[in-house]
Swiss-Prot record:
The gene is selD. Keywords: ATP-binding, Kinase, Magnesium, Metal-binding, Nucleotide-binding, Selenium, Selenocysteine, Transferase. Mg(2+) binds at D48, D88, D223. Homodimer. This is Selenide, water dikinase. The record marks K18 as: Important for catalytic activity. Belongs to the selenophosphate synthase 1 family. Class I subfamily. It comes from Carboxydothermus hydrogenoformans (strain ATCC BAA-161 / DSM 6008 / Z-2901).
Length: 343
């Protein structure tokens, strides 16, 4: 099979290809109000997945996530896309049951490439303990792949992205820098060892982090993907709460700051930052690349959890025991709708 650089076939890679939050907000406001009492989570809080109660003991959790290639290797594109799709289920505190493939694929590419992508997705689903039961394919000018994932959760144990509580600590379970580094990889300027580290972060499931999150109990949680750390934090806060985050406490993939300094950002970073600026207060002097880094779109990023001070130590300890990063990056405040960024 002839080597094809998948990232060269697309204008925007991975979760950086998401529609801008501003445009999405304009579109979603036209959707009708949901009045079904069994619809426990819908579009109103921009949460990670839909949740529908089917009994007093069970609710279905359903998500769909797909994107353009974030790496050139077809197999690892499949692996990363599947991990990213599963993440929404984990972020809700649910257990995945099965998945369906969602595929857009150009006619000009050999079908063996698609078969390899699907194998990557199936292997990652197998690691998560679920089968892939089918899917849907369309001809497309740019390759796209992802999954619909169905999970289950007790209706009383859903972990939502809102509301957190003032005084909660913010815990992040993966380092940032995926968007800037994958953009550099697309341009061919990222060293092989750095690219390998990015791939390892993206292909890691959030299952262990979710297990601890459910066991300990948190106020709110979400996964960090296309809207960046600041964007998904703002969804957690909405207009009711605020947050303080500390730049020096935010973990980054080795090499990420170097490429941030070169302004190797996907377009989505600027879109995210511009949308959020009215809600941001940078306490002191911050370089543009530092601001963009916090809005950098992540593909298969970590979980962001708001946890009470009483449970924080237990959460961090148990995450670390599972080999999961547990970086305390900030705190929830009562400063409505404002994110204060400090050093």
């Amino acid at each position: 099979m002839e080597a094809v650089k998948l990232t060269q076939l697309v204008s925007c890679a991975g979760u950086a290809a998401k529609m801008s939050p501003e445009t999405l907000a304009q579109v979603l406001r036209y959707l009708p109000e949901i009045n079904d009492p069994n619809a426990l989570v819908g579009t109103n809080t921009a949460d990670d997945a839909a949740v529908y109660r089917i009994s007093d003991e069970q609710a279905i959790v359903l998500t769909v996530d797909y994107f353009t290639p974030v790496v050139d290797d077809p197999y690892y594109f499949g692996v990363i896309a599947a991990a990213n799709s599963l993440s929404d289920i984990y972020a809700m505190g649910a257990k995945p049951l099965f998945a369906l493939n969602v595929v857009g694929f150009p006619k000009k590419l050999p079908p063996e490439i698609l078969a390899t992508i699907l194998k990557g997705g199936a292997d990652k689903a197998r690691e998560a303990g679920i089968p892939v039961l089918g899917g849907h394919t369309v001809d497309d000018a740019e390759p796209k792949y992802g999954m619909v994932v169905c999970g289950l959760v007790h209706p009383d144990k859903i972990v939502k992205n809102h509301p957190p509580h003032p005084g909660d600590s913010l815990i992040l379970t993966k380092p940032l820098g995926i968007g800037v580094l994958t953009t550099g990889m697309k341009r061919g300027i990222v060293p092989e060892n750095t690219a390998k580290k990015v791939m390892e972060v993206m292909e890691t499931l959030n299952d262990k982090a979710a297990e601890v999150m459910v066991e300990v109990g948190v106020s709110a949680a979400t996964d960090i993907t296309g809207f960046g750390l600041l964007g998904h934090l703002k969804e957690m806060l909405q207009e009711e709460f605020g947050a303080e985050i500390y730049l020096t406490k935010i973990p980054a993939i080795e090499g990420a700051w170097e490429f941030a300094g070169m302004r190797v950002f996907p377009g989505g970073a600027k879109n995210n930052l511009n949308y959020l600026l009215p809600h941001l207060d940078f306490a002191g002097e911050f370089a543009e690349e530092e601001k963009l880094f916090l809005a950098d779109p992540q593909t298969s990023g970590g979980l962001l959890m708001a946890v009470s001070q009483e449970k924080k130590e237990e959460l961090v300890k148990k995450l670390q025991q599972k080999g999961v990063l547990a970086a305390e990056i900030g705190i929830i405040t009562g400063n409505k709708g404002k994110i204060v960024v400090k050093r």
